[in-house]
C-alpha cells in the first residue's frame, strides 16, 4: 500500500509541477502579449506623429504657394483696373460725341425695302 500511496504522491507532485509550469508559461505569454501591444502602440504613435508632421509641412507649403498666387492675382487685377480706367478716360469724350451725333443728327431716308404702291 505504501508503494501505491508513494506512486499517487509522485503523480500528484508531477501534476502540480506540470500545472505550475503551465501557469508560468501562461504568465510569460501574457507578459509577451502586453509587451508586444505596448510596442505596437508606441510604433503607431511614432508613425502617426511622423505623418502629422509631414502633413503640416505639406499644408504649410501649399498654403504659402496659395498665398503667393492670391497676391499675384490681386496685383494683376489692380493692373487691369488701371488699364480699363485709362482706356475709359481716353475714349469717353469721343464715344459721347459719337453717341450724341447719332441721336441728334437725324437724316430721314426711305428704307430700301419700301415699295411705293400706286
From Swiss-Prot:
Keywords assigned by UniProt, alphabetized: Coiled coil, Hydrogen ion transport, Ion transport, Transport
Residue stretches in coiled coil: 5-53
Domain of life per record: Eukaryota
InterPro entries (UniProt xref): V-ATPase_G
Tissue expression per record: Kidney.
Subunit structure: V-ATPase is a heteromultimeric enzyme made up of two complexes: the ATP-hydrolytic V1 complex and the proton translocation V0 complex. The V1 complex consists of three catalytic AB heterodimers that form a heterohexamer, three peripheral stalks each consisting of EG heterodimers, one central rotor including subunits D and F, and the regulatory subunits C and H. The proton translocation complex V0 consists of the proton transport subunit a, a ring of proteolipid subunits c9c'', rotary subunit d, subunits e and f, and the accessory subunits ATP6AP1/Ac45 and ATP6AP2/PRR.
Family matches, as NCBIfam families: V_ATP_synt_G (TIGR01147)
Role description: Subunit of the V1 complex of vacuolar(H+)-ATPase (V-ATPase), a multisubunit enzyme composed of a peripheral complex (V1) that hydrolyzes ATP and a membrane integral complex (V0) that translocates protons. V-ATPase is responsible for acidifying and maintaining the pH of intracellular compartments and in some cell types, is targeted to the plasma membrane, where it is responsible for acidifying the extracellular environment.
Protein name from the UniProt record: V-type proton ATPase subunit G 3
Amino acid at each position: 500500500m505504501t508503494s501505491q500511496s508513494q506512486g499517487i504522491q509522485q503523480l500528484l507532485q508531477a501534476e502540480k509541477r506540470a500545472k505550475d509550469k503551465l501557469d508560468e508559461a501562461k504568465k510569460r505569454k501574457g507578459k509577451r502579449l502586453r509587451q508586444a501591444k505596448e510596442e505596437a502602440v508606441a510604433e503607431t504613435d511614432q508613425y502617426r506623429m511622423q505623418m502629422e508632421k509631414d502633413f503640416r509641412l505639406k499644408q504649410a507649403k501649399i498654403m504659402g504657394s496659395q498665398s503667393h498666387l492670391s497676391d499675384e492675382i490681386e496685383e494683376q487685377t489692380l493692373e487691369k483696373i488701371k488699364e480699363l480706367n485709362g482706356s475709359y478716360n481716353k475714349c469717353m469724350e469721343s464715344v459721347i460725341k459719337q453717341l450724341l451725333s447719332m441721336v441728334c443728327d437725324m437724316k430721314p431716308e426711305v428704307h430700301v425695302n419700301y415699295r411705293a404702291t400706286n
